[in-house]
Amino acid sequence: MKLKDTKSRPKQSSYGKFQTKGIKVVGKWKEVKIDPNMFADGQMDDLVCFEELTDYQLVSPAKNPSSLFSKEAPKRKAQAVSEEEEEEEGESSSPKKKIKLKKSKNVATEGTSTQKEFEVKDPELEAQGDGMVCDDPEAGEMTSENLVQTAPKKKKNKAKKGLEPSQSTAAKVPKKAKTWIPEVHDQKADVSAWKDLFVPRPVLRALSFLGFSAPTPIQVLTLAPAIRDKLDILGAAETGSGKTLAFAIPMIHAVLQWQKRNAAPPPSNTEAPPGETRPEAGAETRSPGKAEAESDALPDDTVIESEALPSDTAAEARAKTGGTVSDQALLFGDDDAGEGPSSLIREKPVPKQNENEEENLDKEQTGNLKQELDDKSATCKTYPKRPLLGLVLTPTRELAVQVKQHIDAVARFTGIKTAILVGGMSTQKQQRMLNRRPEIVVATPGRLWELIKEKHYHLRNLRQLRCLVVDEADRMVEKGHFAELSQLLEMLNDSQYNPKRQTLVFSATLTLVHQAPARILHKKHTKKMDKTAKLDLLMQKIGMRGKPKVIDLTRNEATVETLTETKIHCETDEKDFYLYYFLMQYPGRSLVFANSISCIKRLSGLLKVLDIMPLTLHACMHQKQRLRNLEQFARLEDCVLLATDVAARGLDIPKVQHVIHYQVPRTSEIYVHRSGRTARATNEGLSLMLIGPEDVINFKKIYKTLKKDEDIPLFPVQTKYMDVVKERIRLARQIEKSEYRNFQACLHNSWIEQAAAALEIELEEDMYKGGKADQQEERRRQKQMKVLKKELRHLLSQPLFTESQKTKYPTQSGKPPLLVSAPSKSESALSCLSKQRKKKTKKPKEPQPEQPQPSTSAN
């Protein structure tokens, strides 16, 4: 058999290939003699030859990456060999460090040489780079096939080493969820005021950590009847009064009591039963019986704490991180733990192995993965005593996220697991969260009912539900809203009914009754709705049996005392003027409400043209973007959020200074909840209504329902600045309208062209929106837009609130007087409104003319 000429070997691209893989070829390839008897059976007819390389160098790609990954053409053999010999002579002058190599012998196939596997023991191998040469003479026995196999493994190892810094950082720094809820550090407040309310000891510890030294009125009146007497609660309190903790603490207490009653006894023998694995030492367990066996003399609260919290260290770590990584990843739409570079687990570098060992390792890892999945499924099946114990229903997704965060903060030292089920997020992630069998679930009705219909095993048996909470209940049970909620409540009160279940219902407008529409009042058999009738109807829809405890702390006005209400009467076209004037004159964290999504989109485009970058929040947005905008709005001090009534209920955004009703709400309940986004927790806030001609009817209904004794004051506006404001708004409207029409036309025409191309038909000019695009007309439009934008930029570059100096005589310099900036904007809208009130009260009343008294004459 004729062998291939060995001189043609270096002409192949193997030199550059081996160089990029970390091996520098110094010598020549030599032919390996093969026994001719190996070709007798005819199975090796395709074999050409075997070649071996004995003279080479190990090169680190990190030392000189530019030379290893160079895109230059390969040099000729003679030139390359001469350059390598020169480099070797230059390197031989410097002392070379010998590296001890560990040999790992493998069983070789018959007729082939024994292959050697080397593992570098010197940690300075990567640092030495090109200055290292293998001194072992047996290294030359490595064949070209083995070199090709080991090279990709080295590349994989280097890729792993490159990820190690980020992996170590991700392992040390816990993943932090971005929420609009402010961070609270360990304040260690005095919680003696909570002890008479039967609050569990681990919850008291969390309250001290959060700095809640005293309960609010709604919490004082709710906790004792709910925890001690286990009564159903109908609670109505002002916005920002702490209703979340009023139902979260009784729910946590009910879960802890269930865990105490169903605590498993400790095992008598130390060996694990067959088919089960023994937990490792120091691992966190959820066996409350172990803590109970260790200390039988503890008080009841301490027993509960020990049962729910087997490891204080793990609980404190959970408190610092604010929950597990997977919980936060589920909340905010991030990838699962273990997906992506930020959640990788740092692994030790794997030593080089031959092909057989790599296959065995892959099989072993695959088997371990299957075993882990089987263990997870078995774990879900071996926890029959961890059912769903608490369920919280909320009307909006953002409110559900907030409620879960508050429950986690209070239950951080109890070991209770929570999960959130809302729309707009991955169903698979939420199913994996349910696989952990959380004791408490916070959900919106739609997604919860969807998972119940899919018959998830954690949601199959709701008879063991110990606590049901309906937050913002008046909105949840409104006719025409949340059809899934009525089906869910019907199931809970029929097939899944539990007589021991406790129901807690809360809302800021639970007892507020607004006037029904005229079309309903004119009907014959219409009953007038009052407070008692509304509560009875609510209890009937929710399915509350028995007589619950009603706690009503709302005022007649239904708004908080620290809220300042004001209004501006204007035309519909002038609302943009006053909105822009207010945002420029009184910067801060402002929340603007409108009744429709189209109005929000128009305002967003208009304000962006005016160099105000607002954030938006409405139902048509993606859930990730909604949460991201809320977090950014809470983080920035001077920011504007344009929102529909999605953001009106329950959201606790810190330090919102102004709430502006661009459109008057249709009902008084919506007005109360909108205004409740500011003036929370004894802070002051301002609520401004822009009332147009079409809003007068709704405004009168709200004024009548809230039983206002005094008229809402007018907000002071300095009319001398309105001319400049109107000019800016006029230009901005033209630019925004032109851009919007052009965008809609391009969108429509693009869709038409794609549809025509798919159908292979020709389009006529009248099918295009606005006619077929004319280059000359488009050029003229763009030129006009440039002129308008240039004029608007000139106006925006000048200060808006300025006062000109009026001089009686010509100036000495012969130039017009300079504009003097208006007083600083440190004065807030609240202080400006209070000054106006003081001026009105200080005006002396006009003296009335004295009436002449009738004279009396003596007879």
Curated annotation (Swiss-Prot):
<feature type="region of interest" description="Disordered">
    <location>
        <begin position="799"/>
        <end position="859"/>
    </location>
</feature>
<comment type="similarity">
    <text>Belongs to the DEAD box helicase family. DDX24/MAK5 subfamily.</text>
</comment>
<feature type="modified residue" description="Phosphoserine">
    <location>
        <position position="82"/>
    </location>
</feature>
<dbReference type="InterPro" id="IPR014001">
    <property type="entry name" value="Helicase_ATP-bd"/>
</dbReference>
<feature type="compositionally biased region" description="Polar residues">
    <location>
        <begin position="106"/>
        <end position="115"/>
    </location>
</feature>
<keyword id="KW-0539">Nucleus</keyword>
<keyword id="KW-0347">Helicase</keyword>
<feature type="modified residue" description="N6-acetyllysine">
    <location>
        <position position="71"/>
    </location>
</feature>
<keyword id="KW-0963">Cytoplasm</keyword>
<dbReference type="GO" id="GO:0003724">
    <property type="term" value="F:RNA helicase activity"/>
</dbReference>
<dbReference type="InterPro" id="IPR011545">
    <property type="entry name" value="DEAD/DEAH_box_helicase_dom"/>
</dbReference>
<feature type="compositionally biased region" description="Basic and acidic residues">
    <location>
        <begin position="277"/>
        <end position="293"/>
    </location>
</feature>
<feature type="short sequence motif" description="DEAD box">
    <location>
        <begin position="471"/>
        <end position="474"/>
    </location>
</feature>
<keyword id="KW-1017">Isopeptide bond</keyword>
<keyword id="KW-0067">ATP-binding</keyword>
<keyword id="KW-0694">RNA-binding</keyword>
<dbReference type="GO" id="GO:0005524">
    <property type="term" value="F:ATP binding"/>
</dbReference>
<feature type="compositionally biased region" description="Acidic residues">
    <location>
        <begin position="82"/>
        <end position="91"/>
    </location>
</feature>
<keyword id="KW-0832">Ubl conjugation</keyword>
<dbReference type="Pfam" id="PF00271">
    <property type="entry name" value="Helicase_C"/>
</dbReference>
<keyword id="KW-0378">Hydrolase</keyword>
<feature type="binding site">
    <location>
        <begin position="237"/>
        <end position="244"/>
    </location>
    <ligand>
        <name>ATP</name>
    </ligand>
</feature>
<dbReference type="GO" id="GO:0003723">
    <property type="term" value="F:RNA binding"/>
</dbReference>
<feature type="domain" description="Helicase C-terminal">
    <location>
        <begin position="578"/>
        <end position="723"/>
    </location>
</feature>
<dbReference type="GO" id="GO:0016887">
    <property type="term" value="F:ATP hydrolysis activity"/>
</dbReference>
<dbReference type="GO" id="GO:0005737">
    <property type="term" value="C:cytoplasm"/>
</dbReference>
<dbReference type="InterPro" id="IPR000629">
    <property type="entry name" value="RNA-helicase_DEAD-box_CS"/>
</dbReference>
<feature type="compositionally biased region" description="Polar residues">
    <location>
        <begin position="823"/>
        <end position="834"/>
    </location>
</feature>
<feature type="compositionally biased region" description="Basic residues">
    <location>
        <begin position="95"/>
        <end position="105"/>
    </location>
</feature>
<dbReference type="GO" id="GO:0005730">
    <property type="term" value="C:nucleolus"/>
</dbReference>
<feature type="modified residue" description="Phosphothreonine">
    <location>
        <position position="302"/>
    </location>
</feature>
<feature type="cross-link" description="Glycyl lysine isopeptide (Lys-Gly) (interchain with G-Cter in SUMO2)">
    <location>
        <position position="370"/>
    </location>
</feature>
<feature type="modified residue" description="Phosphoserine">
    <location>
        <position position="287"/>
    </location>
</feature>
<feature type="modified residue" description="Phosphoserine">
    <location>
        <position position="94"/>
    </location>
</feature>
<feature type="cross-link" description="Glycyl lysine isopeptide (Lys-Gly) (interchain with G-Cter in SUMO2)">
    <location>
        <position position="825"/>
    </location>
</feature>
<feature type="modified residue" description="Phosphoserine">
    <location>
        <position position="60"/>
    </location>
</feature>
<feature type="compositionally biased region" description="Polar residues">
    <location>
        <begin position="799"/>
        <end position="814"/>
    </location>
</feature>
<keyword id="KW-0597">Phosphoprotein</keyword>
<keyword id="KW-0007">Acetylation</keyword>
<dbReference type="Pfam" id="PF00270">
    <property type="entry name" value="DEAD"/>
</dbReference>
<feature type="cross-link" description="Glycyl lysine isopeptide (Lys-Gly) (interchain with G-Cter in SUMO2)">
    <location>
        <position position="808"/>
    </location>
</feature>
<feature type="cross-link" description="Glycyl lysine isopeptide (Lys-Gly) (interchain with G-Cter in SUMO2)">
    <location>
        <position position="624"/>
    </location>
</feature>
